[in-house]
Amino acid sequence: MALFNDEEQQRIRVAIEDAEKHTSGQIRVCIEKTCNEAVLDRAAKYFHKLDMHKTKHRNGVLIYVATVDRKFAIIGDKGINKVVPPDFWDSTKEDMLEHFKLGDLVEGIVTGLEIAGEHLQKFFPHGAGDTNELSDDIAFMDGE
């Protein structure tokens, strides 16, 4: 059985699209079952594997979730980390964690996407000629 059914995957994809509507920022969601290393190291590995560091403004954000190990991380590229408050990712993670604790993985991810999108549009508003540089599909990994 798939981790997310088609409806849940579509809900996450639409949340990514909505979050990116008013920003040049690029957001991806990466899901795998287990994380066999430090969660931030694992997220950074997939950040690069998914070419998120190649965006025009270096404003990619990755939400990484290891479902079985119950670990997750949010990382942003250099352009974002220069302008967001130091606790930005921590406060976003806390909001997501409230949903995760209730067993609602999809709602937690959607919450993270909404918050990331709101903040990104403040620092990286959508401009003329901005394009969707990265796929909005969920990246399902299997310990790659």
Regions found by a protein language model. Give the residues of each.
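A structural boundary signal for the start of the first folded domain, especially the loop/turn
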Residues: 1-144
